Amino acid sequence: MRGDSRLRTTEMSPAETLDLAEFHGDGISAELSEAVHHVAAQLPMEVHFHPVDLSIERRRTDAEGSYQDAEAAIRKLGVAIKYPTTTELESPNKVLRDRFDFTVIHRPVQTIPGVPTRYAGKVDIHIVRIAVGGTYEDAGRRIGTEAAVSVRVIERRPSFEASKFAFDLARKLKCDVVSASKYTIQRATDGLFEEVAEEVAATYPDVQHHAELFDALLAKLIMESEAYKVIVTPNEYGDFLSDAACGMIGSIGLGASASYSFDRDGRVKLAMFDPAGGTAPDIAGQGICNPAAALLAFGMLLEHQGYRALGGALNDAVRDAISAGNTTGDLGGSLNTMGFTQEVCLAMKARLTGSVNL
């Protein structure tokens, strides 16, 4: 059941429910799911998870069946949370992206006090990435033994949907939009992307916009990260930028992302939320993984579904727990997965009851 767009409070009916698909994967997937379920149980509402097995074991014997189950679940419910999956014969992320027609990926990256980092500046950016095209759609082919070639594609519709999402987000955040590509070199492909971004910008007179060359943006982001808030880019540029930004805040394990598909009127039709990290097979099953990104992804899901107060409280609670030094071993702390999750629940309760010192 989708929440409305109004800011919700903790004064909800206990009968209010949220149904979502839950895509289980590999490695630490089960531990991340347990953390998300534990947090969901503390919310003043009922959350119903509808599980789908996307593990490598099932995909080895029934890959098509696993993807069909995932597609049926998200099309019925409209929203899903996904945990890390192993890439073997195919990338499950790409398969799902193609089946669900995901054209936009949104990755927020924000400095968290208390996380050791080699970067002294403050990062608080939203990376909006076209989820298709670029150099990722064509693996290319060899020409003889000494050369290879691949085709790079930029399409108008995904460029429009990513740009519109970025401008809607900037309007909500009251900030400007930077579109970034190599439009002076890739004049046809990146030129089309920037052309579409300009067309969308013209329909948002209240949102400032300018284009920057992607390589220059990387340098300026490091030198003056506070100058950037919403950045929209083609596929591979957004991929590079997302990981670089997570490195600037000290850990790729602190990144969550959302993937979206849209109807003909530009409204979000399907949404999937996932932690950015991998399956971490070296620590799987030990109960010591960091669930922060999975919890942040769940917070994004709650906000998307209209439960803005709850989603915001959860996102803030993750940051509160880490800032207070209540962290897992990868961030220098001593807590295990569930110990950190419990600290997040305490911080979330304090946020929702107004007893936290802001």
Residue ranges and their predicted role:
Residues A21-Q42, G144-D215, A227:
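Glycine-rich phosphate/diphosphate-binding loop of Rossmann-like nucleotide-binding domains
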Residues D138-A139, I143, A147-S179, Y183-R187, ...:
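Glycine-rich phosphate/pyrophosphate-binding loop and the adjoining helix
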Residues V36, A197, A294-L302, V344:
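Buried hydrophobic packing segments
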Residues E46-D69, L221:
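N-terminal beta-loop-helix "entrance" segment that forms/cooperates
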Residues D19-G25, A80-Y83, D176-Y183, L296-E303:
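Short glycine-rich or small-residue beta-strand-to-loop segments that form or flank ligand, phosphate
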Residues R59-V149, E236, F240:
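N-terminal glycine-rich phosphate/adenylate-binding segment common to multiple enzyme folds
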Residues I222-N326:
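Glycine-rich phosphate/nucleotide-binding loop
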Residues D26-S29, G78, V128, A166, ...:
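Buried hydrophobic positions in well-ordered alpha/beta secondary-structure cores of metabolic enzymes
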